[in-house]
Amino acid sequence: MTQAEIKLCSLLLQEHFGEIVEKIGVHLVRTGSQPLRVIAHDTKASLDQVKKALCVLIHHNLVLYHVHKRGVVEYEAQCSRVLRMLRYPRYIYTTKTLYGDTGELIVEELLLNGKMTMSAVVKKVADRLTETMEDGKTMDYAEVSNAFVRLADTHFVQRCPLVPDTDSSDRGPPPPAPTLVINEKDMYLVPKLSLIGKGKRRRSSDEDATGEPKAKKPRYTDNKEPSPDDGIYWQVNLDRFHQHFRDQAIVSAVANRMDQTSSEIVRTMLRMSEITTPSSAPYTQPLSSNEIFRSLPVGYNISKQVLDQYLTLLADDPLEFIGKSGDSGGGMFVINLHKALASLATATLESVIQERFGSRCARIFRLVLQKKHLEQKQVEDFAMIPAKEAKDMLYKMLSENFILLQEIPKTPDHAPSRTFYLYTVNVLSAARMLLHRCYKSIANLIERRQFETKENKRLLEKSQRVEAIMASMQATGAEEVQLQEIEEMITAPERQQLETLKRNVNKLDASEIQVDETIFLLESYIESTMKRQ
């Protein structure tokens, strides 16, 4: 765990949950697993505060607990899961593109709340969608339920593990902490609910003394009975989203290298195996050309012969994204996911070197990568770059840890005159170094965004007050002159300052998302490589 990762975890926890949860979470990230009383003692927080903070972190899957041999419950932070909070906007946007506004709000609610029952999600999303509709229109619960079922069928949401039913005859002492289990076949099984009702608008005139709307409620709440899916909680399956991001990156890479038809064939192969292939698998399931041909999108008019030619072209490509086994029946084709990720990570490194040091350095990097080991004189000859420039470029990349220098002595005394000095590239080491820098960049971006917001806090509060006043006056039917007077409470210089702030914050947000895309590619490559070793 590097200092950059710990700092980023701290910023993310503080931004999402506040200071107390951030203090407990970062303490666990730094120290590893600890029992409750040790956490309270070390952080100087009260037991009640620690318990509440741990409840929040466990509910959002950011902390795990396990029973020690001596019966003590220890809590352990999941740093990698905390860092996934960076990707929340990307998860939500992806769901919007695949399943529309309803799917987007379902995933958003699950991410914001950690775990929820299906009935609670459906009700909340229906209410939110009804708020955005025209007067007189409402969102039916059944429509939201259908979107939820589609997300479960494609494994984007999954059930949370449950406490198993215990035998009532077993009167032994209860365990210090419950053990949560779930059958793999039940992870995506949606409970059969007959949710009848529509979304409701929040209006003061429709609320009773308790603050609850008087509109028609679902049948199961009328009798104050627990919902039929009480105890069955759902969460977002982040691994499935990562699989989708990886597939999109591979399809985009094939489109850039070849053409749109090739990328569509690869997309079809990935779509056919997305449910059957585990996210950590190095290869997809083998597919015949006939299966691929039958699964091509409707209206994609290419003949079987043309498809076979494209598959042969993809299989013969030096990058080896597609592998072929056997020739019977046209052969079986697989996508080599590990090699695809390695190519994407290498391309990312080349791009960074080109941006930082120029095209000549990128040429030298590609050359050393291709030849594995080269002396300085060989680099000069192969790259056709003058000796002085080549030396400067090699030392620049060496000092930044993009390339390595390997010493091979001819004699045991390691005398410089009798030693070969070979330049080489360790892609895994370079990827780790770049990943560390990406974490530092994201932390700097978040701090800058917080600074910009803090500097203009008074102006932002004034703007929000004016907007609230205008909204209430519009609702009561105020005249245009009155609205204009309220609007003029913010002066022209202040309005210009707000526009500048908005533009800067949008740039910082966009930069965070772009850096996170690089982080995802590098993390996927490192994880895939470590599993192969």
UniProtKB/Swiss-Prot annotation:
A GO cellular-component term linked to this record: nucleoplasm
Alphabetical UniProt keywords: Antiviral defense, DNA-binding, DNA-directed RNA polymerase, Immunity, Innate immunity, Nucleotidyltransferase, Nucleus, Phosphoprotein, Transcription, Transferase
Classification via InterPro entries: POLR3C_WHD, RNA_pol_III_RPC82-rel_HTH, RNA_pol_III_Rpc82_C, RPC3, WH-like_DNA-bd_sf
Modified residues (Phosphoserine): 194
Subcellular location: Nucleus
Major site of localization recorded for this protein: nucleus
Pfam families cross-referenced by the UniProt entry: HTH_9, POLR3C_WHD, RNA_pol_Rpc82, RPC3_helical
A biological-process GO annotation: positive regulation of innate immune response
Presence of the UniProt keyword Nucleotidyltransferase in the record: yes
Compositionally biased residues, Basic and acidic residues: 211-227
Function: DNA-dependent RNA polymerase catalyzes the transcription of DNA into RNA using the four ribonucleoside triphosphates as substrates. Specific peripheric component of RNA polymerase III (Pol III) which synthesizes small non-coding RNAs including 5S rRNA, snRNAs, tRNAs and miRNAs from at least 500 distinct genomic loci. Part of POLR3C/RPC3-POLR3F/RPC6-POLR3G/RPC7 heterotrimer, coordinates the dynamics of Pol III stalk and clamp modules during the transition from apo to elongation state. Pol III plays a key role in sensing and limiting infection by intracellular bacteria and DNA viruses.
Record-stated family: Belongs to the eukaryotic RPC3/POLR3C RNA polymerase subunit family.
Subunit text: Component of the RNA polymerase III complex consisting of 17 subunits: a ten-subunit horseshoe-shaped catalytic core composed of POLR3A/RPC1, POLR3B/RPC2, POLR1C/RPAC1, POLR1D/RPAC2, POLR3K/RPC10, POLR2E/RPABC1, POLR2F/RPABC2, POLR2H/RPABC3, POLR2K/RPABC4 and POLR2L/RPABC5; a mobile stalk composed of two subunits POLR3H/RPC8 and CRCP/RPC9, protruding from the core and functioning primarily in transcription initiation; and additional subunits homologous to general transcription factors of the RNA polymerase II machinery, POLR3C/RPC3-POLR3F/RPC6-POLR3G/RPC7 heterotrimer required for transcription initiation and POLR3D/RPC4-POLR3E/RPC5 heterodimer involved in both transcription initiation and termination.
UniProt-recorded name of the protein: DNA-directed RNA polymerase III subunit RPC3
Lineage: Eukaryota, Metazoa, Chordata, Craniata, Vertebrata
Recorded name of the encoding gene: Polr3c
